[in-house]
Each structure stands twice: as structure tokens, then as C-alpha cells.
């Protein structure tokens, strides 16, 4: 695992730093190897297949070109769920999760009607519907690419 981590650190340092670099490396390794975070920290030896090595180089190249990891992987976490994302939608941000939490706290005992215009990945509408089952929520987007 150390060789894989070192390769990623060498390839991506200068583009990413500190905690962000550590998180990106951990995410790439866990997703590529199909392991959880605990296994990532405990696993010592890793041998990549030729296909995994090619995939890894492609990920590195795209990251070096400034493409967000979430777009490369096609997914992003939000409010304890995972959402499909592509370049047609905004990547869900922690600040948006705070907005969802605030709406839930403010309307926990009510039956709100919520309209999510420009929903993109649908993460806000879906997170709100999970946490406010009594709410009526409608979401739409003009972009067919965003909704697929």
C-alpha cells in the first residue's frame, strides 16, 4: 500500500496538499481496491493488476488537469448518501448539507412544500425527503444531462 500511496503523493503533490491530498489518495485507493477505510490503514501489500494500473494513471492524469475526483468517479457523498454526479451538475458541498440540516430543524414539525429549481443531482430534494417525510417536495432541472 505504501508504494501506491507514495506514487499518488508524488504525482499529485503541488496540485493538492495536506488533508485534501490525504483524503483524495484514501478515496482513490479504497475505491480502486474495493476496501473500506479501516482496511486501507491496515493493508500492507497491494499488487495492482495491469487494468488497475492503467485506470490509476488515467485518474492521475485527469486530476492533474484539474478535474474534480467526484466527476472522475461519477459520485459524491452528501448527507450520508451517495449521489451520481457528472460535469452537468454541481458537486454537493458541505455548506449545502448545512442548509439541509437547517431546513430540517426549522420544519421538523411542519408539512412544508419545497420546490428545488435547478436540482442537478437531486441531492437537496432527496436528502430533504428522507429527513422530512411529511414534506411535499418537487424538483426539476432544465438540463437533461443533469437528470441522468
PLM regions with names:
Residues 1-73:
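N-terminal auxiliary segments of SAM/dcSAM-dependent transferases
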Residues 44, 58-132, 137-148:
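SAM-dependent Rossmann-like transferase core, predominantly class I methyltransferases
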Amino acid at each position: 500500500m505504501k508504494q501506491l500511496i507514495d506514487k499518488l503523493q508524488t504525482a499529485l503533490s503541488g496540485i493538492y496538499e495536506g488533508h485534501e491530498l490525504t483524503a483524495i489518495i484514501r478515496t482513490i485507493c479504497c475505491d480502486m481496491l474495493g476496501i473500506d477505510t479501516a482496511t486501507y490503514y491496515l493493508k500492507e501489500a497491494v499488487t495492482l493488476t495491469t487494468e488497475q494500473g492503467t485506470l490509476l494513471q488515467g485518474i492521475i492524469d485527469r486530476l492533474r488537469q484539474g478535474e474534480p475526483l467526484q466527476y472522475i468517479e461519477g459520485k459524491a457523498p452528501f448527507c450520508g448518501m451517495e449521489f451520481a454526479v457528472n460535469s452537468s451538475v454541481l458537486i454537493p458541498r458541505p455548506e449545502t448539507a448545512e442548509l439541509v440540516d437547517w431546513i430540517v430543524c426549522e420544519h421538523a414539525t411542519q408539512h412544508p412544500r419545497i420546490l428545488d429549481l435547478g436540482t442537478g443531482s437531486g441531492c437537496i430534494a432527496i436528502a430533504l425527503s428522507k429527513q422530512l417525510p411529511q414534506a411535499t417536495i418537487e424538483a426539476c432541472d432544465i438540463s437533461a444531462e443533469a437528470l441522468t
